[in-house]
Regions:
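C-terminal beta-strand edge segments of enzyme domains
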Residues: 89-155
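Short secondary-structure boundary segments
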Residues: 58-59, 87-90
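Active-site catalytic loop in hydrolytic enzyme cores
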Residues: 1-49, 62-71, 75, 141-144
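Conserved acidic residues
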Residues: 52
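Residues within well-formed alpha-helices
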Residues: 75-76, 105
Length: 155
């Protein structure tokens, strides 16, 4: 981070080789983890796979959490027009002999990017009712997926 502290998750963990969705009733869920939120295209791919809600269990450091956590999750919600349910560890724990402190602040964001539930510092939880009508309205009123696909952008 900008304060000189660092943590490189990729030194300990490898990437998966496929995107995952599952069904609960009539709702398609997209599954990601912590570092995945830095890849907007992954969230768009989950949307194309039918995701309406994307889960993001995470373990963000204090610095990256403070600077990136909420803004990135809200951005992924807006871009994908999916609900984002981000559960985050909080506090300190031992990892390979060193104490690591993590940010917490679990949250739920709607497809418009509004944070509709948020945990504060400390232990706690955030809950929200996922409303499919909100998803349908946002996607109807601003059909970004169809517009994006129609443009066939290549950089």
């Amino acid at each position: 981070g900008p304060d000189g502290t660092g943590y490189r998750e990729s030194a300990l963990y490898g990437a998966g080789d496929k995107l995952v969705t599952c069904q609960i009733g009539d709702v398609t869920l997209g599954l990601t983890i912590c570092y995945d939120m830095r890849f907007a295209e992954q969230y768009m791919a989950l949307r194309r796979m039918g995701a309406e809600v994307i889960f993001v269990p995470s373990n963000f450091t204090l610095q990256t959490g403070k600077d990136h956590w909420e803004v990135m999750l809200r951005s992924r919600a807006i871009e994908s027009q999916c609900w984002i349910a981000a559960a985050a560890s909080w506090g300190g724990y031992d990892e390979r002999g060193a104490t690591r402190f993590v940010y917490g602040h679990s949250l739920v964001a709607d497809p418009w990017g509004h944070v509709v539930a948020k945990a504060s510092d400390g232990q706690g939880w955030a809950t929200a009712r996922i409303d499919p009508a909100v998803t349908a309205r946002v996607r109807r009123d601003m059909p970004v997926l169809e517009h994006r696909d129609a443009r066939r952008l290549s950089l």
